[in-house]
Design a protein with these regions (language model features):
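An acidic/histidine-cluster motif and surrounding catalytic segment
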Residues: 1-103, 107-148
Length: 151
């Protein structure tokens, strides 16, 4: 049995109760990053997630997705990332869910421990006419993104 001293005092699975379906983008060649995400989902008792096999802009043929000339201002990695997000959105649109979360395999849910609100509280404060909400911490190091799509 877990004692009070050994428990994570900031963890409350109730914070993420009712969280939207998650579509997590992960390159096939990076299983350690998928394991990292699965460990976080397990920790927070999140079960409604789907792994999206990411496109590799350096190697994959994306001609079925990108018509015409590839964008010249984007790196092959950015093209792969963008098309992977489109792939995740297509999967979401096959469902009846009112909205979903698109995230990449480097997303860190650690900050949830410090929320003084729940997922339901957060969604309740979105503008009534919202379409997309992007939650991100942008730093000079790793980028962690959580996007919400509402149709």
């Amino acid at each position: 049995m877990e004692t009070l001293d050994s428990m994570d005092k900031n963890k409350s699975v109730h914070k993420l109760k009712g969280i939207a379906p998650i579509y997590c983008i992960n390159l096939d060649g990076q299983p350690e990053r998928w394991e990292y995400m699965e460990n976080q989902f397990k920790y927070w008792e999140i079960e409604n997630y789907t792994r999206i096999s990411a496109y590799d802009g350096r190697e994959d043929d994306l001609s079925d997705i990108i018509k015409g000339t590839y964008p010249t201002m984007m790196s092959s990695g950015e093209i792969g990332c963008t098309t992977s997000h489109l792939k995740a959105m297509k999967e979401f649109l096959k469902t009846d869910a009112p909205y979903a979360i698109m995230m990449e395999d480097d997303c860190d849910l650690e900050l949830v421990k410090f929320w003084n609100f729940t997922w339901a509280d957060l969604v309740a404060h979105f503008p009534y006419d919202w379409d997309v909400v992007q939650m991100a911490i942008i730093c000079t190091g790793d980028l962690h993104v959580l996007s919400l799509i509402h149709i």
